[in-house]
């Protein structure tokens, strides 16, 4: 339904945000829909409706960070640029037994440099999409965070973490995320005739039962 309603970047850019969010229901976080809408508007306004073809320009679009921009450029245009999402960080850190603490910006920058040096150098239109996809798939399916399937790994012979006998020690990241909890109330108000009171949420612009939190956000 989403693609039927917005078949082109121009169609998405011209649509009201309410329409975009309504059709996004069930497709993921609404922040992604808002970024997608802003991105489409930016592509139309700054690039004449044609997506830029370099990672550097792609990264200037709303909602697109360095790794996503590089992935698009590598897959679509064969550009020689590295990605460094969670899966790739884990794969490279284990293969290299990388001792840098990825909670520190300096260590992450150094890993970016290493990832770039390891990129293919020939026949980039074919090798860059394949290499990029291979790293992502390896991290998602075999080189998992807690139970890496080392016996089936195609780069086992190259993996310094495996040779050390402790691949799960990598990547090193000292910062621990603090978890928090929140209690929310949702009001269900119905008239005698069966009508239900709905209010528009200020964040996602969709209609739902009112919540005390809505007042704080409006």
Language-model features, listed with the residues they occupy:
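Generic structural motif recognizing short loop/turn segments at the entrances and edges of beta-strands
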Residues: 166, 194-195, 209
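Conserved N-terminal beta-strand and adjoining loop/helix that marks the start
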Residues: 171-196
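Conserved small/polar residues in nucleotide/adenosyl-binding loops
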Residues: 207-214
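Catalytic cores of DNA base-excision repair glycosylases
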Residues: 1-151, 155-168, 181
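Residues in intrinsically disordered, low-complexity segments of regulatory proteins
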Residues: 23, 111, 184-187, 196, ...
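Beta-strand scaffold of nucleotide-dependent catalytic cores
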Residues: 197-201
């Amino acid at each position: 339904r989403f693609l039927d309603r917005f078949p082109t970047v121009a169609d998405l850019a011209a649509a009201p945000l309410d329409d975009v969010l309504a059709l996004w229901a069930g497709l993921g976080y609404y922040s992604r829909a808002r970024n997608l809408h802003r991105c489409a508007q930016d592509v139309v306004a700054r690039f004449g409706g044609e997506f830029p073809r370099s990672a550097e320009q792609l990264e200037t679009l709303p909602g697109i960070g360095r790794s996503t921009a590089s992935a698009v450029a590598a897959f679509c245009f064969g550009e020689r640029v590295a990605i460094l999402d969670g899966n790739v960080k884990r794969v490279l850190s284990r293969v290299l037994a990388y001792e840098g603490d990825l909670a520190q910006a300096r260590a992450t920058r150094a890993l970016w440099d290493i990832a770039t040096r390891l990129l293919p150098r020939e026949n980039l239109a074919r090798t860059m999409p394949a290499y990029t996809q291979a790293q992502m798939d390896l991290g998602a399916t075999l080189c998992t965070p807690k139970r890496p399937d080392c016996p089936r790994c195609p780069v086992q012979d190259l993996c310094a973490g495996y040779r050390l006998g402790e691949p799960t020690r990598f990547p090193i990241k000292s910062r621990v995320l603090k978890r928090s909890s929140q209690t929310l109330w949702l009001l269900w108000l119905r008239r005698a005739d069966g009508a239900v009171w709905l209010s528009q949420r200020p964040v996602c612009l969709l209609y739902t039962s009112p919540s005390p939190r809505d007042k704080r956000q409006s």
